[in-house]
Design a protein with these regions (language model features):
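Cys-dependent protein tyrosine phosphatase-like superfamily
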Residues: 18-178, 192-292
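Bacterial N-terminal signal peptides that target proteins for export
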Residues: 1-6
């Protein structure tokens, strides 16, 4: 029973509804139309993805702003519609970076629109997640599900600095818009967005606020997944205990920040020393992605 429920959970996490419901002509192009350069339009209207959003508009500590239409974070793109594909092309996206593991990509291969380059940077922090969740559902462990994601955020700093260095170097070298994603668009992609914004000079609090927007943008989907898990288990499983896995908590990203700060003294030093991104590199990044 619990293996079945665990399977249902991962199926639901991977599931997206793909029906062309959003008129392509009415989708916002932030870069060329300042009417869309606001919080109301930060989440992109996608038929086959739930957490695709803009990183433009965030203010930096020196009074500049992140350019609209240059940086996008997302969940997986394996179920996007033809209209979604055209939309990504209309946004001018040059490159898609995928943080998913080999197994995740085999289960749900990305749909890459024509003319957009695709780069794989696998981060496999979820390899043992299924068995851990099954143990929680069975009551065999008192360890909270949220502790799994706390540990994962520590690993982003301790075990995957090389991947995140490669990610930032791709942004530095890329001249056009980039979209980066994982499966749910919240943990691996969330940390990538966080270090990018920190490197650009956005305050830690504003970075955390962007991280937390996942809960706002995916709330309806989270409720659907919880209802589905309870239904498939004939209400024998308490799906509520899995809620921390489906969204984000401030503690997750703060754990990553604390891990970096304890080892390197500050997030800025983590980027310089832990990710080997020099001050010259940071200036190049800012020249590309910031405006006055």
């Amino acid at each position: 029973m619990f293996k079945k429920v665990t399977g249902v959970l991962f199926f639901c996490l991977a599931l997206t509804q793909c029906s062309e419901t959003t008129d392509l002509m009415n989708r916002p192009i932030h870069k060329t139309d300042n009417a869309f350069q606001n919080e109301e339009h930060r989440l992109l209207p996608m038929d086959g993805a739930h957490n695709t959003r803009e990183l433009g508009g965030y203010k930096t500590n020196d009074g500049k702003s992140v350019k609209w239409g240059m940086l996008f974070r997302s969940d997986k793109l394996s179920d996007i519609s033809k209209a979604d594909q055209q939309y990504l092309q209309n946004l001018g996206i040059n490159k898609i970076i995928d943080f998913r593991s080999k197994e995740e990509k085999a289960e749900d291969p990305n749909i890459i629109p024509k003319g957009i380059s695709y780069v794989e940077m696998p981060i496999s922090v979820d390899g043992a997640m299924r068995s851990k969740i099954e143990a929680v559902l069975k009551g065999e462990t008192n360890k909270e599900v949220k502790s799994f994601l706390i540990d994962a955020n520590k690993e982003f700093v301790s075990d995957y600095s090389g991947v995140y260095e490669e990610f930032l170097r791709n942004l530095i070298d890329e001249d056009g818009p980039t979209l980066f994603h994982c499966t749910a668009g919240k943990d691996r992609a969330g940390f990538a967005a966080a270090i990018t914004l920190i490197a650009l000079g956005v305050s830690k609090e504003n970075v955390i606020q962007d991280y937390m927007k996942t809960n706002q943008f995916t709330q309806e989907r989270i409720e659907e997944i919880i209802d589905q898990i309870e239904l498939m288990s004939l209400y024998q499983a308490d799906a509520e205990i899995l809620r921390p896995l489906l969204g984000v908590e401030r503690e997750y990203i703060e754990t990553a920040f604390k891990t970096a700060e304890e080892k390197f003294g500050s997030l800025e030093n983590f980027i310089r020393e832990g990710l080997n991104i020099s001050d010259k590199d940071i200036q190049k990044l800012r020249n590309k992605y910031l405006e006055s």
